[in-house]
Amino acid sequence: MDAGSPENTVPYINKQLIAELHLCYPEVDLQMVETAYGAMSCIYAALGKKFIVIIDEWDVLIRDEATNQSVQNDYIQFLRGMFKGSEPTKFIRLAYLTGILPIKKIKTQSALNNFDEFTMLDAKIFAPYIGFTETEVRTLCQQYHRDFDEVKRWYDGYLLGEYHVYNPKAVVSIMMWGDFQSYWSNTGTYEAIRPLINMNFDGLKIDIMAMMAGDKVKVRTKSYQNDMVSFKNKNDILTVLIHLGYLAYDCKMKMAYIPNEKIRSEFVEAVEENHWDEFIEFERKSRDLLNATLDMDSTAVAENIEKIHMDYTSMIQYNDENSLSSVLTIAYLSAMKYYFKPIRELPTGRGFADFVFVPKHEYVNIYPALLVELKWNQSAETAIAQIKERKYPSALESYTGKILLVGINYDVKTKEHQCRIEEYQC
């Protein structure tokens, strides 16, 4: 049945529920009652009956009628009448609401503050039930003869509590059809990405590009109003993208990131369709850096990293090796067409490699793997020596393609980068 229009949704819900309640409890006079919660209150007063209320997709009006303030106000008032305060606890035994967004905020407070919320920011005990856990995916891969490492690379990424959680639609589809593609976007609110990431908030575009390159970015989630219009800064945009599932969230580090290969491809498509001038120019410079790396042109690599740092990431203040790694991550953004997300701190023979870029399978015979070691106020030669001494290439012993060793150093006194590149000889 259909309410006919968004404006008629709340009156329609009240009318239908009152009619159904009258059929179930004809002995209770509901003729003067105007709301569903008023009817439940009358039934409780007369018969002592309590109700279980389940609302699926509670937030559909918040999302689909984002700019219709009148409809949203009517709906929020309906929910407040149904659930807020002590009166509803008399006639409601249990209320269970599902949706994408948390409960709408009025100013800084939840419109319904007597609910326990389980969200993509903090799933609590529901974490293992939001999607398939890694253990479940591993079992399914054995059952359906799929490569678990590939499934993990393409569809893992959501970290909820202690659980790695996979999108159930994507997992079921890959088990059934065996083709690594973006099953996810067909079921999500993909059209929401483009207007969101195109909003002109300070620092938003550079954060999006950093995450596309494989980095994590800090995000403050408290100011988000849990709707699709009340955005005040980049943190609100990043937070809604977390709730929509397009970003994952590390609750310990308070950082957002793109969870996996397939969602990263969605961001690339959205950014390209938006025709960001910043992205087009940045990608060109990043491509120059990648080409210089592949050509083993150490001087050009150092110059390009310097240029990218000055032009695009000047807000990152160089003060240690970690800040250098942040610049390096975004500098190699163009590599993401041919390489999987860079692996940070990969365990190796004796220690951890700073960055490892592994080509996608279709590019293994075209592009080399890159082992990158960073140094701060030392030398590029020291970085290369450490790669060899600590046997970092052993981490890629099953890799059959070419491997380049890349050492990068930043000299605090000269304010310059240095680079050295060698081909690994087994």
Whereabouts are the PLM-identified features?
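Mg2+/Mn2+-dependent nuclease catalytic core
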Residues: Q72-F78, W376-P393
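Conserved catalytic cores of phosphodiester-cleaving nucleases, focusing on short active-site segments
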Residues: L328, A353-P359, Y367-W376, R390
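Structural motif
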Residues: I52, P368-V372, L404
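Feature representing long, continuous alpha-helical segments
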Residues: N322, S326, I330, A353-F355, ...
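Active-site metal-binding core of divalent-cation-utilizing nuclease and nuclease-like domains
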Residues: C42-L47, M336-I366
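Domain-level recognition of nuclease-like catalytic cores that cleave nucleotide substrates
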Residues: A395, G401-C426
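Phosphate-binding site recognition
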Residues: M1-D320, A335, Y339, I343
